[in-house]
A protein has these predicted regions:
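Short, small/acidic-rich helices and loops at N termini and domain boundaries
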Residues: 1-93
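Glycine-biased, small-residue-rich flexible motifs in mid-sequence functional cores and linkers
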Residues: 1-10, 17-18, 45, 91-390
Length: 390
């Protein structure tokens, strides 16, 4: 198949209207990996065919039909991307950065990356340096120090191409002859002035430009906020130069802390007005101007991320027990290995149940996912296809 035709399908799938990232990723797993279909084969089907084979909602069927009818327009965009030297990296590609999947999981990993530059930078250890657009002198000095320190350690610096900290991180990295990834808050085809400005480092393989949004999408506040998760997701280390108590940097750090990420925040000077100390209270690690961990006088707060209290009464999860045998556990252990029909489960576990009883149990169990088809198959709800999220 012509390469840009295949990429056309990926553009269509990645930007289905109002589909969440998780829903899109589960759709990709369902079609590509569970059903072993190509996108060409899938879109050969009509609405009736999709309805017979898959458990799509009416809205999803309409969205897929719209995407199918939109293919001619998307094909022109795919061809333009190819002709202008852009690359499209789908989530099932070996070029897709493993660290992004590890950090964002199936829920938030973008289905497609649009890039320009040396794609090998996506596989190198990376450091994110983030902060306010209106950062003070100390924050910019910190950014400069951490960027140049990262270059000496042969790490890629990831930033978001906003004013303030982002721009300082990029400029300091280039000045030190380092490598950088720019994560855009817009479609990659709308960044023409940036490509002209950074033409030389891009061509030399020192700068890679990346977007996850529709190629022709203009800059947007919502996209800028969404982009922050990808900056954090691409990095193994995250440094915060300066944060307000709201906005993109703050939201990104809070999200990172909830994901149990280690986040390093510059310890502010006494008269500075920012939310850096509050982030330390919430569990971030305080660092000095050189990015080295320092003892903090602020005690971490336990409000946001406190585990369930020992005194809290929790209703135990129900299990199906047959004599001394925990059948539910046996079924879940089997489903850890892959997908099975009701008949295959009965045979593998030698259960003294009829098919209807087992099917009812499987459909009602919150840990089990139903894969539509004839016959239906079952797997663990939290089981992620190793070829996508290994």
């Amino acid at each position: 198949m012509n390469e840009y035709i295949d990429k056309t399908y990926w553009i269509a799938v990645a930007h289905l209207p109002k589909w969440t990232t998780e829903r899109t990723n589960r759709f990709i797993i369902q079609i590509i990996h569970e059903n072993k279909m190509s996108w060409a084969d899938f879109f050969e089907l009509d609405k009736k065919g999709w309805k017979e084979l898959f458990a799509f909602t009416e809205k999803e069927l309409s969205d897929l039909e719209y995407a199918k009818n939109d293919m001619p327009r998307l094909a022109f965009i795919a061809e333009q991307l190819q002709n202008e030297g852009f690359q499209i990296i789908p989530i099932n590609s070996s070029d897709y950065p493993v660290v992004l999947k590890e950090n964002l999981k199936i829920k938030s990993s973008p289905p497609v990356l649009y890039i320009k530059g040396r794609k090998g930078l996506l596989q190198e250890d990376a450091v994110a340096i983030v902060g306010s657009r209106k950062a003070g002198a100390k924050a910019l000095e910190f950014t400069d120090h951490v960027a140049k320190k990262s270059v000496k350690e042969f790490k890629v610096v990831v930033s978001g191409f906003a004013k303030g900290v982002d721009k300082q991180a990029l400029d300091s990295t280039i000045e030190a002859n380092g490598k950088s990834i720019i994560v855009l808050p817009q479609g990659i085809l709308t960044f023409q002035s940036g490509f002209k400005k950074y033409y030389e480092p891009i061509v030399n393989g020192d700068v890679l430009v990346l977007s996850t949004f529709f190629p022709k999408a203009g800059w947007d506040v919502g996209l800028a906020m969404a982009r922050n998760a990808y900056i954090y997701g691409l990095a193994k280390e995250i440094y915060v130069a300066e944060s307000d108590s709201k906005g993109g940097t703050w939201e990104g750090v809070i999200d990172g802390l909830k994901r149990q990420r280690k986040i390093y925040v510059r310890y502010p000077e006494p008269k500075e007005k920012n939310a850096n100390l509050k982030l330390v209270e919430l569990g971030a690690l305080s660092v000095n101007m050189d990015g080295k961990i320092v003892a903090s006088k602020v005690m971490p707060s336990k409000e946001l991320f406190e585990p369930v209290s020992k005194n809290e009464v929790k209703e135990p999860s129900a299990t199906y027990e047959d004599g001394k045998r925990d059948i539910e556990n046996d079924i879940l252990e089997l489903l850890n290995k892959g997908t099975y029909t009701t008949k295959e489960i009965l045979l593998a576990l030698k259960l003294d149940w009829d098919s209807r009883k087992l099917t009812n149990f499987l459909k009602k169990n919150p840990n089990i996912k139903v894969i539509a088809g004839k016959p239906a198959k079952f797997t663990r709800n939290d089981l992620i296809s190793p070829s996508l999220f290994g």
